[in-house]
């Protein structure tokens, strides 16, 4: 049976509290709710902006985060 996991910057966490602490420690990072490792991502949540979005997959969510990071990096 697969269990829900929380993905933040390459790491998986079993509970939201730990994932949120890590996301806040590393900066403005999304928390992805997944069903098992590298499976379908259900939701992504940004603790800083409190934005919640439905995602299609972990890879799609990672790609979106990388694009956001790149766009922020070039703006500065």
Language-model regions: role of each:
Residues 4, 14-34, 57, 61-67:
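A short, charged, amphipathic alpha-helix used as a generic interaction element across diverse proteins
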Residues 9-12, 17-18, 27, 50, ...:
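Short linear sequence elements within intrinsically disordered, low-complexity coil regions
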Residues 1-9, 28-50:
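Short aromatic-glycine-(Arg/Gly/Cys) micro-motifs in beta-strand/loop hairpins
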Residues 38-74:
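Acidic/polar low-complexity segments and flexible, solvent-exposed patches
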């Amino acid at each position: 049976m697969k269990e829900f996991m929380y993905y933040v910057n390459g790491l998986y966490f079993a509970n939201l509290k730990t994932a949120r602490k890590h996301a806040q420690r590393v900066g403005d990072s999304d928390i992805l709710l997944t069903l098992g490792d590298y499976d379908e991502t259900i939701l992504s949540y940004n603790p800083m902006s409190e934005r919640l979005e439905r995602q299609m997959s972990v890879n799609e969510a990672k790609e979106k985060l990388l694009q956001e990071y790149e766009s922020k990096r070039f703006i500065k």
